[in-house]
Design a protein with these regions (language model features):
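Glycine/charged-rich beta-loop-alpha catalytic/anionic-binding loops adjacent to active sites
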Residues: 19-20, 109-117, 231-240
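N-terminal positively charged helical leader segments and presequences
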Residues: 1-89, 187
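Structured adenosyl-cofactor binding patch, chiefly the S-adenosyl-L-methionine
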Residues: 96, 134-138, 152-165, 226-270
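Short pre-catalytic strand/loop immediately N-terminal to key active-site residues, enriched for Gly-Thr
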Residues: 26, 119-123, 237-245
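Amphipathic alpha-helical repeat scaffolds
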Residues: 32, 123-131, 247-252
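RNA substrate-binding interface of SAM-dependent RNA methyltransferases
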Residues: 69, 80, 98-197
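Active-site/ligand-binding-proximal alpha/beta "capping" segment
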Residues: 191-244
C-alpha cells in the first residue's frame, strides 16, 4: 500500500493536473468511479495505473470485475495519498493514470462521419466537457478541437465528460482551415452557431439539418471570429422565445447537435 503522500511516485501522478506534465508524458488523470468504469469498459488498454483506497475498491464490485477481466491491477493507497494525487476534494476512492489516445483529423474524416462537433477557441473546461458529453449522447461521430481550445485531458474537462471521452474520437490541435477543408472533402456541410446567423428553425424547415454536418462552435465570450464564420456554409442562431439574453455555449451546442441528430434520423434512408 502507498502511504506517503510526498513520495516521488505520488507527486508524479499529482503533476498530471498540470498541462505541461500531461504534454510531456502523454498521460492524464482520471478520478472517481464513473470515469474509471468507462475507461475499463472502452479503453482498458490505455490504463497505465489504477489506485484505490480499500474502502473505495470494496464499494464497486462491478469495477473490480472489469479490472480483473482487463487484467488491470489495482494498487491500494491511503486516503491521504489519494487526496494528494487528485484534483478534486473528494475523489471518491479511485484514481487512474491513463494514456492519451487522440485521433487524427485525417482519420476522423476518412471514416465518413455524418455528425461532427468542431470547437474553435473554446476555453472553459466545463463547457468543453459538456459539449463532448452532448456530442456522445446525440450520436455524433467525433469532436475536433482547433486553435487554443482547452486541453481535453484537463481534469475538469475529463470530469465534465462523465466518461464520454472514451466513447467517441477526439482530435486535438488542428488548424481550423485544414479541418474545414477535410470536412468539405468528406461531404459535410459546415454550420456555424452564432448570434449573427439565420434562424435555425428556418434551416430545419429547409431540410438543411438532415444533411451530413459539422457544427462549428466558438469562444464563450467572443463567439466565432469573422474569418472562421467565412469558412462556414451557413451561419445559424438559436431563437430565444423567452426573456433570456442568450444561452451559454455548452447548452447551445447541445441543442444544435440534437437538432441535427433528430433531423438525420427522421430523414428517409438513402
Amino acid at each position: 500500500m502507498l502511504e506517503n503522500p510526498r513520495s516521488p511516485r505520488v507527486r508524479a501522478v499529482a503533476k498530471l493536473t498540470k498541462r505541461s506534465a500531461r504534454t510531456e508524458t502523454g498521460l492524464f488523470l482520471l478520478e472517481g468511479p464513473q470515469s474509471v468504469r468507462e475507461a475499463l469498459t472502452y479503453r482498458p488498454e490505455a490504463i497505465v495505473e489504477l489506485f484505490a483506497t480499500p474502502g473505495g475498491w470494496e464499494r464497486h464490485p462491478d469495477i473490480r470485475a472489469k479490472a480483473a477481466d482487463a487484467d488491470v491491477r489495482v494498487e491500494y493507497v491511503t486516503e491521504d495519498v489519494l487526496h494528494a494525487m487528485a484534483d478534486t476534494v473528494t475523489p471518491q476512492g479511485l484514481v487512474s493514470v491513463v494514456r492519451q489516445t487522440p485521433t487524427s483529423v485525417r482519420d476522423i474524416f476518412d471514416a465518413a462521419p455524418r455528425l461532427v462537433a468542431i470547437c474553435e477557441e473554446v476555453r472553459d473546461p466545463g463547457n468543453l466537457g459538456t459539449i463532448i458529453r452532448a456530442a456522445d449522447a446525440a450520436g455524433a461521430d467525433a469532436v475536433v478541437l482547433t486553435g487554443r481550445t482547452v486541453d481535453p485531458y484537463n481534469p475538469k474537462v475529463v470530469r465534465a465528460t462523465t466518461g464520454s471521452l472514451f466513447h467517441l474520437p477526439v482530435s486535438v490541435g488542428g488548424e481550423l482551415p485544414d479541418v474545414i477543408d477535410r470536412a468539405h472533402a468528406a461531404g459535410l456541410r459546415i454550420l456555424a452557431a452564432d448570434v449573427k446567423g439565420d434562424d435555425l428553425l428556418a434551416a430545419r424547415a429547409e431540410g438543411v439539418l438532415a444533411e451530413p454536418t459539422a457544427w462549428l462552435f466558438g469562444n464563450e465570450a467572443r463567439g466565432l471570429e469573422d474569418d472562421a464564420l467565412e469558412l462556414a456554409d451557413r451561419v445559424l442562431r438559436l431563437p430565444i422565445f423567452g426573456r433570456a439574453e442568450s444561452l451559454n455555449l455548452a447548452t447551445a451546442a447541445s441543442v444544435c447537435l440534437y437538432e441535427s441528430a433528430f433531423a438525420q434520423r427522421a430523414a428517409p434512408a438513402g
